[in-house]
Amino acid sequence: MARCRHHSGYLADDEASHSMCSARVQLPKKPLVPEMRPACKPGRVPHPPSTCGSSALQGQRRNKRHPQPFGHFLDFLTESQVLDSLETVVEKATERMAAMKTEAGVPLVEVQDPVEVPSGGRRAHARPSLSTVHRHRVRPTLCTGHPNNYPSSSSSMSNCHSSLMAGCLGSHSRDSDLGAQGSLPPVRDKLLLEKNLKRLLQLEREGKGLSQSCSQRDSLLWDSLGSQTSFQWTQEQPLSWFSGLLGSSSGVPEASEPRPGEQEPIFRKREFNKEIKSLLSQLESLDLPGYCPLREPHRTLNFLADHRLFPALQSVVSQAVDKLRGAHCRDGRPLFPTSLEPTSDLPPLGSEPAKPTNGGQPYASPRPTVSSPKMLQRKRKDRGGSPSMSSAQVATRFKLKSPCSSSRFTKKKPLPSISSKSSMSHFSNRLYEELADFLTQQAASLVIRKYEFEKDLSKQLGFFSFPITHVLRDLSLGLKKVKGSRIHLSSETHRSCLLRKLEESKRARQASRLSTSHCSTETPSVQQEPATHTAQDQATEPCRSLYTNLPASRQLSPLEPKLYMSACTGMGSSPPKSKDMDNEGRDKAEIEDEDEDEFKDEDQDEDKDEDGV
């Protein structure tokens, strides 16, 4: 009877048997923690007794004499409900790791089913959401494997059967095949866990999670947790790990799932898609400029500053200022006297022999200036076949004043006289004319080149800058100032100053004509000397007073030769001697008339005094 109770399959009957049967059969086979074993339900049908022979029972007793400590530890975790707490910890840790993202917004750890291949190129969700896991969460159960795990073969079979019915659906064939492998089976088939995760994801999509039975939810929960903990680091694992895992599984995959040999290209494709996605996210995070100069031409000031066009424009003005500042006479004195010492002299870079002048005397250029090739090309294009602006004349020598070129500049400011003495030779006058003419042509070509450059720039960029001609005009009239090589604009316009400058320039032009006519005469009379000195003094004083009133920095402006051209025009165009004699006669007549008027006034005053007396 005790033997029948022993083979009945009820652990409660074995424990409730009489003491002799219990001492003989049950005591040596008791587990470490018997009070924590879950009792079977009384309504459950027991399994038939084991059909193994006496040799099998002796082998089981032999195994139980030397129990494996790892197997007892797993049994302890299962029976004492420690796995429930471990599952909760793993679940929360997995949720937190899955929620972490990098700075680019990409998940730090991507949990994904490696077996599932989405159709149509769509990627499945990485893992079920937290709400789905909690909805399917019931008390987890652990399938520890085949019979012979526990002291009583019948009770272990019944316990394993109940756990298989509750959580491991469709795994009887695998459990029955594991009887000869030992007391504890190896790790569960990963393919089954992956299938359960796939089913859980499908239930989440279709919304059928609430209609499932309790036993199915138990299996889904445990399998999904096992798959989550095993695949939460798939982003860092190599591809061979998945292929080896799938190759070691003994189960046959479904028809819709790919074969284990096809997993390698699939994972390579997924890695490629991840790289493309990361590259696209990096492109979106780049800081593009706020505007494009080609599409928004009204914001091209930044474009000019970035391409260093402002220094190029400023260098044009600086070169003109340096050239005017470094101009010297033959005797070494500066052409434009100023309180500042010239900082740069123009080096003579070679000159071709000068052609004979109107008087037949050849004159070499003392300090020629060479223009850049670009400037020469622009001059050829602008001035065409003009004899006064040819590249050879501008680049290598000074050109004497001709009536054709003098007619182009009608209203120019007179150049200040180098010396007020009447002993200045005819040679120095010619040199003065040549130098003034050359500098005037250089300034005019610079203005034309700058104006065309601004015109082309306004067409390309779509905005109008300040015309250089207006700036130079304001510089000549004193409305703007040049400090060093930079132009400082002034917002105030003085009309009175403008009129005064124009009147002074007109007087100086008339005085320069008188002084030129006096210098051209070869035999001046004694009576003409006072008048000539007076005319030269009048010509010198307005120029000096006007020149000294201006700031020293404005005296170096590139507009000065353009304004002083009228004086050169008067001095350069030497009239015939007959015309000079006529001018001298007119001057004599005017002087005599003035003397007669003075004598008449004195006589009238004397007569009035006598009458009064």
Curated annotation (Swiss-Prot):
Residues 41-68, 329-395, 509-541, 565-613 are annotated as: Disordered. The modification Phosphoserine is found at S386. Residues 577-589 have a biased composition (Basic and acidic residues). It comes from the Eukaryota. One of its GO terms (cellular component) is cytoplasm. InterPro entries: DUF4702. Residues 79-104 form a coiled coil. Residues 590-613 have a biased composition (Acidic residues). Keywords: Coiled coil, Cytoplasm, Cytoskeleton, Phosphoprotein. It is found in: Cytoplasm, Cytoskeleton, Microtubule organizing center, Centrosome. Residues 51-60, 512-539 have a biased composition (Polar residues). This is Coiled-coil domain-containing protein 116. The gene is CCDC116.
